[in-house]
Amino acid sequence: ATSAVLKGMDNLNDQIVMIATTNLFDSFDKALLRRFDACIDFNRYSREDLHDIAEIVLRDFLNKFKHTGRNVRLFNKILDEFNNIPYPGELKNLIKSSIAFSKPDDEFDYLKRLYTAVTNTPNPDVKELQAKGYTVREIEILSGISKSHVSRLLQEV
């Protein structure tokens, strides 16, 4: 199939301008890329840009799902767990699925689900969370353990 596409591109009329877009640029065959006169990378987001975009996406989804609570500070701490924050499309899907599959009777369950998705840690250790700079209240949200119990666990040495 690739060779047929390459042959077709080689035989295009010179009067035709072909423009293509993809978010899978790294997966393309180099021979295919050589057929284009220019390749432009639009992924020039800074980490701060991605945080801003994520907050906008979060706000939009929280407005649609009335059972959710807002904790943008914790949301941003969770985003900081990423070495590389995903680009907007993937970020939107991650946020949407965390909210959509959250427990309706737990207003911050989406944050726990988001943390699990980002860190691949379904049951985070309270001491590790504290070492990462999470507050007792944030640890309560992420671990599901009451604040008083979290405090006792953190006081144990």
List where the protein language model places each region:
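Conserved catalytic/switch belt of AAA+ P-loop NTPases
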Residues: 1-34, 38-43
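C-terminal alpha-helical "lid" subdomain
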Residues: 48, 52-157
